C-alpha cells in the first residue's frame, strides 16, 4: 500500500487484499496475450508461434515486473485456498494455447498422439518453472533469452513430423 502511494481505504476499495492484487498479475499477462494474438501469422509454424508468445511475454515480465512481486504471486498461489488464477483454464492464456496446439496438430506441426490438454499443461508447466527459477535467481539473467534457449529443448519432443523454420 505504501509503495503504491494510495491510502489503505482506496487499496481495499479495489482489492480485497494482497492476494487479490497479486492475482491481478495473471490478468495483466492475459492482456499481453490479447495484444499479441492478432500479430500471429496464420502461415507461421504453431511451435514457432508458441516460442514467439513466450519471448514477448517474458520480455514484458522482465521489463515491467520485479522478480520479488512475481515471487509473491507464485507464493500466494501456492498457499491460497481460493481460486488459483494461474491455473484458471478460462483465462485468455489457456484459450490461446489450446487453439494454437489444436491448429498445430491439425497441420502436422505438433504430435497428434498427445492430447491438446497435455501439450498445454506441459507448456504452461515449463513457463512456470522458468519464471520460478528467474525469481529464485532475483532476476539475475535475461528471462526471455534463457527461455528461448531452454523452451525449445524442453518442448522439442512435441513437434510433429512436419518442420518449418
Predicted feature descriptions by range:
Residues 52, 56-59, 94-95, 99-107, ...:
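C-terminal peripheral helix-coil segments that are non-catalytic and often amphipathic
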Residues 25, 29, 33, 37, ...:
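Hydrophobic recognition helices of helix-based DNA-binding modules
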Residues 58-98, 109, 118:
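Short secondary-structure transition hinges
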Residues 24, 28, 38-65, 116-123, ...:
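Hydrophobic alpha-helical connector segments
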Residues 22, 26, 30, 83-94, ...:
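Amphipathic, non-transmembrane alpha-helical scaffold segments
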Residues 1-20, 24:
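Helix-turn-helix
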Residues 48, 85-90, 106-122, 141-145, ...:
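All-alpha amphipathic helical-bundle segments outside canonical DNA-binding/catalytic cores
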Residues 40, 68-77, 130, 134-138:
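Secondary-structure edge/capping motif, primarily at the C-terminal ends of alpha-helices
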Amino acid at each position: 500500500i505504501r509503495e503504491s502511494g494510495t491510502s489503505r481505504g482506496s487499496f481495499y476499495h479495489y482489492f480485497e487484499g494482497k492476494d487479490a492484487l497479486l492475482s491481478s498479475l495473471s490478468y495483466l499477462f492475459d492482456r499481453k496475450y490479447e495484444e499479441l494474438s492478432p500479430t500471429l501469422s496464420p502461415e507461421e509454424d504453431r511451435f514457432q508461434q508458441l516460442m514467439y508468445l513466450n519471448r514477448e511475454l517474458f520480455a514484458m515480465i522482465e521489463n515491467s515486473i520485479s522478480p520479488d512481486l512475481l515471487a509473491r504471486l507464485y507464493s500466494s498461489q501456492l498457499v491460497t485456498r481460493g481460486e488459483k488464477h494461474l491455473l484458471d483454464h478460462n483465462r485468455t492464456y489457456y484459450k490461446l494455447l489450446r487453439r494454437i496446439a489444436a491448429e498445430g496438430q491439425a497441420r502436422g506441426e505438433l504430435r497428434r498422439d498427445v492430447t491438446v490438454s497435455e501439450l498445454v499443461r506441459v507448456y504452461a508447466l515449463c513457463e512456470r518453472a522458468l519464471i520460478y527459477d528467474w525469481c529464485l535467481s532475483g532476476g539475475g539473467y535475461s528471462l526471455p533469452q534463457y527461455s528461448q534457449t531452454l523452451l525449445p529443448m524442453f518442448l522439442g519432443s512435441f513437434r510433429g513430423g512436419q518442420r518449418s523454420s
